[in-house]
Amino acid sequence: MKTIRLHDKNFRLAIPNGRICDAIGRVADRINKDYAGRETPLFVGVLNGSFMFMTDLIKKIEFQNELSFVKLASYDGTCSTGCVKSLIGLNNPIEGRHVIIVEDIVDTGESIEHMIKELEARNPASGEVCTL
């Protein structure tokens, strides 16, 4: 199996692309079903990790939507610091809106917890997390 070296780390393929694409399709199908007929939801991607996932996901969404991104920092290298900082915040109006946070993976849960608290303080109609 081919390995890729990035800086001082070696990586090998864990999940083939086809399985990832299938999973994204299943997630999109569920979102399409759950949000059919609702007012335009706001998808909020957590950079940098969610960028490609969100791109592939949005291509499969069958209703009008709005996109935004935030950038958070909670790591020093590959280690969690336990402290989440907003580098790029959410500037969109949230009150009364359906919001879907898009994250590539949930590791410690600290970034997602930070996002949920920030959204709840802004009174969305609903809030959900979509993660690969």
Residue ranges and their predicted role:
Residues M1-L132:
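PRPP-associated nucleotide enzymes
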